[in-house]
A protein has these predicted regions:
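Active-site-proximal beta-strand/loop segments in catalytic clefts of secreted hydrolases
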Residues: 109-111, 166-170, 178-182, 198, ...
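A glycine-rich, coil/turn loop motif that links secondary-structure elements
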Residues: 121-126, 155-157, 207-216
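Mid-domain, small-residue-enriched loop/turn segments at the edges of structured enzyme/sensor domains
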Residues: 175-231
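Active-site SXXK
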Residues: 114, 124-154, 166, 285
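Short, conserved catalytic-motif segment at the N-terminal edge
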Residues: 101-124, 147
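Conserved catalytic neighborhood of penicillin-recognizing serine enzymes
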Residues: 147-190, 199-200
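A conserved catalytic-loop motif detector
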Residues: 213-268
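Structured C-terminal helix/loop/strand segments within mature extracytoplasmic catalytic/sensor domains
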Residues: 2-94, 100, 116, 124, ...
Length: 320
């Protein structure tokens, strides 16, 4: 009896362990299953998130608005950056001219800016030889247009042979011969040419066989020289040859601080000078007066006054 009871006791003591082992296996299996489900859900969520990102990509970050660039200021041409003749300088020139006797007309232009100083620009005078300047320009332009031929014989010389002494030496003989060959008058269109230049009384101005006639102002002289400057700038053969003649003029009335293309006029009650001054800052100066004497080409007192005006003009324009 005792033996049988011992066996039964051993049997009963094994069952709890078996149950515990089974429970442990079930717990482990349940835990493993749970972990597998979590991993599967995570993969699915990641895949779904990736799919959504591809279907609806995130908008790119907007860049900050670019400021509108401020344009760089274009520098003004050097000759137009300031007024070449200030109110004070004009007053100084006025005072100098007011101190001088007789009738005076002055026209000064800074070529770069086009700004102009005038003093009694409408005062009129007999033109004397100043009319030779626009007359020579008229001849050269008509030659280029084929309306006349300056290579043609004029007496014993050609027209070109006479242009140089007409301007450089103010030859009245050359003016007589050229005026006989190609008269500059109302009938030939010379007056119309002067009208285009802006002359005050072009109808009475002429260069003809019997002489030079006309009533002009200091402004007329300035405008004629400006037209010549523009013509020289074209650089044509005629323009350069004519410019050479003006540069060769060696009279000494208006002071010029640099080489100048110039033309004077001198007769009774007429002493005039006009010049294109090729300084670093080029300018034109024209001065007409009644200081002339038909017995003296360059009266000393008149010359000295013109020198003073030319000197002050150079100081004003060139800021010397």
């Amino acid at each position: 009896m005792k033996t049988q009871t011992r066996k039964q006791r051993k049997k009963h003591t094994r069952w709890p362990w078996i149950v515990m082992i089974l429970i442990m296996i079930l717990i482990i299996a349940a835990a493993a299953h749970s972990m597998m489900r979590q991993a599967s859900n995570a993969d699915s969520s990641a895949a779904q998130s990736s799919s959504v990102s591809q279907a609806h990509p995130a908008p790119a970050q907007e860049s900050e608005p670019t400021a509108t660039p401020v344009p760089t200021a274009t520098p003004e041409p050097e000759l137009a950056t300031d007024r070449p003749i200030t109110t004070e300088e004009a007053a100084e020139m006025d005072a100098l001219l007011d101190s001088m006797p007789g009738s005076i007309s002055v026209w000064i232009q800074d070529i770069g800016s086009g700004l102009t100083y005038t003093y009694k620009p409408d005062n009129g005078f007999y033109c004397a030889s100043t009319l030779k300047a626009p007359y020579a320009l008229w001849l050269c332009q008509r030659d280029e247009e084929g309306l006349l031929d300056l290579d043609a014989a004029v007496g014993s010389e050609s027209g070109w042979d006479l242009i140089y002494p007409l301007i450089a030496h103010s030859s009245n003989g050359a003016a007589h011969d050229l005026g006989a060959m190609w008269p500059g008058s109302l009938d030939t269109g010379f007056s119309d040419f002067l009208t285009e230049l802006g002359f005050a009384s072009p109808e009475g101005c002429e260069v003809v066989e019997d002489g030079i006639h006309g009533w002009v102002t200091g402004a007329d002289g300035g405008r004629a020289m400006r037209a010549l400057y523009d013509y020289f700038e074209t650089g044509t053969e005629n323009a350069l040859e004519l410019q050479e003649a003006f540069l060769a003029a060696d009279h000494d009335l208006l002071y010029c601080p640099a080489p100048a293309a110039k033309k004077y006029g001198s007769w009774d009650q007429a002493l005039h000078d006009m010049a294109i001054v090729y300084a670093e800052r080029p300018y034109i100066i024209s001065m007409f007066t009644d200081w002339g004497d038909q017995e003296v080409s360059f009266p000393e007192e008149g010359r000295e006054r013109m020198q003073q005006v030319g000197q002050l003009a150079a100081e004003i324009i060139l800021n010397d």
